[in-house]
A protein has these predicted regions:
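Terminal-region recognition feature
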Residues: 1-127
Length: 127
């Protein structure tokens, strides 16, 4: 071992290159259907807010909007929130989505809406 610490080569730990994979959750139609009520225009946001929650809310809102009759096309979506919060970036994504929908979104707190959940609760665009 030499006295100069900077002259030594670092040990190689692996011969394979580092791969970055983004895990994509499988789309489970039964799970999506359990989180919405098309007749009442209800979408449920229950649990922690993360990147999967963002995708989940977008899919659920699209399902509600796409399965409405033409008479109910402009009725508001009711987003029911029960969350301790979570990722602020995902919450901001949900807020951007809500603000850019063609229909109003009523936000309803059932239980708790803390942290990122409170941001989403305050962002409702309905009555």
């Amino acid at each position: 071992m030499s006295d100069d610490l900077y002259s030594e080569e670092p040990e190689k730990t692996s011969e394979t290159p580092l791969e970055i994979t983004i895990e994509k959750p499988p789309v489970d139609l039964q799970e999506i259907e359990s989180g919405i009520s098309i007749d009442d225009s209800l979408v449920y946001l229950i649990g922690p807010i993360d990147e999967f929650t963002l995708t989940d809310i977008i899919v659920k809102c699209r399902v509600v909007i796409n399965n409405r009759d033409s008479e109910k096309a402009k009725l508001p979506i009711n987003l029911v929130i029960d969350s301790f919060g979570g990722c602020a970036f995902s919450a901001l994504g949900i807020i951007d989505y809500i603000e850019n929908l063609d229909v109003p979104v009523n936000t309803i707190c059932r239980g708790k809406a803390m942290s990122a959940g409170a941001l989403i609760l305050a962002a409702g665009t309905g009555t």
